[in-house]
Design a protein with these regions (language model features):
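Two-component/phosphorelay signaling modules centered on CheY-like receiver
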Residues: 16-35
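Alpha4 helix (beta4-alpha4-beta5 surface) of REC/receiver domains from two-component response regulators
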Residues: 23, 68, 91-106
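Helix N-cap/capping motif at the beta->alpha junctions
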Residues: 36-45, 66
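Short amphipathic alpha-helix used as the core "switch/output" element in two-component signaling
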Residues: 45, 67-80
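Active-site beta3 strand of CheY-like receiver
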Residues: 50-56
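Active-site residues of response regulator receiver
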Residues: 58, 88
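Receiver (REC) domain active-site loop signature in two-component systems and cognate sites
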Residues: 61
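C-terminal output helix
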Residues: 94, 112-121
Length: 129
């Protein structure tokens, strides 16, 4: 499925370089409606206030990590079905199991490239239609 330019995506990572790389990758795909947050707490506020189609969030962040954000999103009635891709620098099984139990739609191990991100997004968004 082609990704629509009108997709509204929230990128959550405490590292500006990762947010910038992810933004550039999304822009190469033609996606222009991109929000950013530095931590889970900030992201939760954005997700509640802004209509979104997808959250792409890092796991390790201060204040509220990606798993905490995922649980908060799944626990909030208005946004609980929002598609969620978790980014991690670790591909450990325990994290993957915890994320799956919390309701993650997909995960991606950093570093990643354009093709892998696109594939994960298409899988997640295609499953939502």
């Amino acid at each position: 499925m082609p990704l629509a330019a009108s997709l509204k995506v929230l990128i959550v990572d405490d590292q500006m370089s990762v947010r910038q790389f992810t933004r550039m990758t999304l822009e190469k795909m033609g996606i222009r409606l991109i929000h950013e947050a530095e931590n889970g707490q900030e992201a939760l506020g954005t997700a509640i206030a802004q209509p979104l189609d997808l959250i792409i969030s890092d796991f390790n962040m201060p204040e509220m990590d990606g798993l905490g954000l995922l649980r908060a999103v799944r626990g909030h009635q208005a946004i609980r079905k929002l598609p969620f891709i978790l980014l991690t620098g670790r591909g450990d099984r325990e994290l993957v199991v915890k994320a799956a139990q919390a309701g993650v739609n997909n995960y991606l191990v950093k570093p990643f490239n354009d093709a892998i991100l696109r594939q994960k997004m298409e899988q997640v968004l295609g499953a939502m239609t």
